[in-house]
Every structure is written in C-alpha cells, then in structure tokens.
Amino acid sequence: GDNGLLARVGVDLLSIKPRYKGEASMLQNGDIVKYTALVDDRITTVSPFVYMQYKGDKFQFRVKSILAQAGEHMNLNGGYGVTAKSNGLDEDGHWEYTPVRYSSSWVSMMYGKKWQGILFAGYAKNLGTADGLLPDTTYNGVNYADISNNYLSKNTYANINSMWRLAPGVVRNWGKLALSLEWHITSVQYGELLKLKVVESDGKKTTHSYVQAENGMAENNLHWITNHRLQMMLKYSF
C-alpha cells in the first residue's frame, strides 16, 4: 500500500520578465531625447525544498521546509524589488531586481482510525531581500524604498516579519462520513512601515509607505498579533 517512508528534495525555478518596455534617453543634436524602449528586464529565482512523510496503520507524519525566493506563486509572502535603474543618458532603460527571501516550515501529524487526533504546527520567517533596494528617500539617516516603486508582497503585507500557527484537532469517522473540530492559533509579528506624505506633481498630497532599503523589511516597532479560530467541518467522501 502507501504505508512507509517517503522523502523528496526539490528546487522551484522561476524566471520572469517584470517589464518589456521602459524609459530611455539619448543625446541628439545637443538635446536629451527621451523615448520608450524595449527592455530586457529579468529576474530568476531558485527555491529549494525538502519534504518527508511517514504513513503507518494508525500514525501519519508529514514535514516540509522551503527557502523561497519571490515565493508568492507558492502562496508564500514574497515579491521582489528594484535594485538599480539604467535610465541615464545613453543607457538602455532596463532595471535590476532582487527577490524577497522567505523561510517556511511545517509539520502535520495524525493518529487513530475511528477517532483521530491531529496536530499542525508551522513557522515562517521573512528574511528580507537578497540585495538592497534602490532608495527613494532618507529619513533619520536610514535609506528607505517606496513600496509603490517595487513589487513587494502583492498577495499579503510587506510589514510581516514572522508568523507561526498551531492547530490541534480531533476527527470522528463513520465510514465515508467524518466530523472534525480544529482550534487554529495564529500569531503574526508585524513591523511599522514608514509613512510619509508626498506632494505629487498635481499638487495633491498622498501618503506613501516605505520599507528599509537595506533589506526590504519593516523592523521598527515589532509587535505580535494573535488570532484564535474554531473550525468545524462535516465531510462526506463519495
């Protein structure tokens, strides 16, 4: 059957072109001429992972750990940022990028047949960008990058530092019918984004959010927020 030990090691490779056109400029008859150019932007990321599972008659065990770069396509906190812009005179207009690195590990256990005890535990840590971001402003001697000029954490929040979840539960099985009750405890450590009001070209004031340019993180005023959730599910398997 499917009982026994299974182990896997793998790598997720992602290579994308964030833009295909951009602004460039050249000197023509003594004038600086700006134009839209086709650019060769590209970011390539490598995310290694390990996975192991064990299945016995009554006991099941699974564990996975991944070190992700720009892992939003794997439903992880991710994204990438801009490290350099070649928008100067006689430059081709391309940008350089760096990924957000994210470590995520979890373990899942189940024991029993008619009555089953289950436990899930997971931890994730934002490790920041691999290289420093292109700074947009300096505040109190620290370089900051505007989130709107980058592609950070589009599916979640750029100010998440780390998080953990613990979810114990119990399942009662009646053949194809199962009733489960789970208690999810989730805690997230947030940092405080730098928020500054900017006067735009049309004279309007808008609030911009910034992360530290050194690592793409928000590490000021770190604080934990914990959420408790009870979840009950009735399932019938055809």
Cite the ranges covered by each PLM segment.
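Structural signature of outer-membrane beta-barrel channels/translocons
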Residues: G1, Q53-D57, S108-K114, V171-G175, ...
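Detector for outer-membrane/organellar transmembrane beta-barrel domains
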Residues: D2-I160, W164
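Extended, charged low-complexity segments
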Residues: S104-M109, Y210-V211, N215-N227
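Conserved C-terminal beta-signal and adjacent last beta-strands/turns
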Residues: S105-V107, L119, M163-L177, M232-K235
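Substrate-binding/catalytic groove segments of enzymes
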Residues: Q116-I118, G128-A130, W174-S180, G191
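C-terminal beta-signal and adjacent terminal beta-strands/loops
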Residues: K176-N215
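Outer-membrane beta-barrel "beta-signal"
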Residues: L222-F238
